[in-house]
């Protein structure tokens, strides 16, 4: 609460009351609730300060699909895949990068980045190899004609794919090079859900940018209160960008708060 007579803000808990001329809100989002960052402060701020809030949702999280086939291959990863999300047969987003099989879902950098655009009911398309389908089929056929090995071995040797993945993929497709090429360059899954805040690397949504002076990180309508990090409606791709924003916005908020003391 604002105490105009003393020029200070008051924060009242169930045990005591704190008074301060400046406050920095840095309680994080809803991700990793085990650390204490469970998002409860958002409802308090909305109630007491009448702040506009963008709905909170998990960001940079794994994607769960119907009939996920790779539970037994958990831990297997691919360095360069192409991931697409389709909605009503139209491409919503595309990412290139690493893919990881887990016990329950798809993960890895490309999946995490594209999860921000995905919704249940969308189609997830995975290209394990980024090359024209006809080219993949031709290479497979040529290798098969020269080798007496089975298709799993041919697949692994030709494209340097994990052997266990090759074995499972062959068992899930018609025993033909064309069918394998189709699976390698566009295997489709229906998205059932995104993993929740427990597995999300960051939180999307939060205090609307319109409420904040981004030069100082001070709330426009509440002098002396500053915000930083995941509390703000800003989220980025994997690669340290969210951490850097937390550090930079926190530093800006601290320097701005000091000037008022």
Segments from the language model and where they lie:
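A glycine-rich dinucleotide-binding beta-alpha-beta segment and adjacent secondary-structure elements
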Residues: 164-235
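Conserved mid-domain beta->alpha element of the FAD-binding
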Residues: 116-120, 151, 176, 224-225, ...
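A conserved FAD-binding loop/helix module that cradles the flavin
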Residues: 29-44, 234-261
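Short hydrophobic core segments
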Residues: 17-33, 45-46, 99-102, 225-227, ...
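An anion/pyrophosphate-binding glycine-rich loop and adjacent beta-alpha core
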Residues: 50-175
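Glycine-rich loop(s) and the adjacent beta-strand/alpha-helix scaffold that form part
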Residues: 22-68
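Glycine-rich phosphate/pyrophosphate-binding beta-alpha loops
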Residues: 32-33, 62-63, 102, 106-109, ...
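Conserved beta-strand-loop-beta-strand element in the redox core of flavoprotein oxidoreductases
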Residues: 1-18, 23, 87-89
């Amino acid at each position: 609460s604002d105490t105009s007579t003393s020029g200070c803000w008051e924060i009242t808990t169930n045990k005591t009351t704190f008074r301060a001329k400046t406050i920095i809100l840095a309680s994080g989002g809803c991700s990793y609730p085990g650390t204490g960052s469970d998002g409860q402060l958002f409802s308090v701020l909305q109630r007491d300060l009448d702040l506009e809030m963008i709905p909170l949702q998990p960001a940079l999280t794994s994607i769960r699909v119907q009939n996920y086939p790779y539970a037994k291959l958990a831990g297997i990863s691919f360095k360069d895949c192409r991931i697409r999300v389709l909605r009503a047969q139209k491409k919503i987003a595309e990412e290139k990068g690493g893919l990881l099989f887990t016990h329950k879902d798809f993960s890895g950098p490309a999946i995490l980045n594209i999860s921000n655009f995905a919704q249940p009911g969308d189609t997830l398309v995975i290209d394990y190899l980024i090359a024209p389908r006809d080219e993949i089929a031709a290479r497979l056929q040529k290798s098969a004609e020269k080798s007496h090995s089975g298709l799993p071995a041919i697949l692994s040797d030709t494209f340097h794919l994990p052997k266990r993945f090759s074995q499972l993929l062959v068992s899930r497709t018609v025993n033909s090079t064309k069918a394998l090429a189709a699976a390698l360059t566009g295997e489709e899954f229906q998205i059932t859900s995104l993993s929740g805040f427990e597995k999300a690397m960051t939180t999307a949504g939060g205090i609307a940018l319109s409420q904040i002076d981004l030069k100082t990180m001070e709330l426009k309508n509440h002098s002396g209160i500053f915000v930083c990090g995941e509390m703000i409606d800003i989220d980025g791709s994997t690669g340290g960008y969210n951490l850097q924003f937390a550090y930079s916005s926190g530093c800006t908020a601290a320097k701005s708060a000091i000037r008022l003391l």
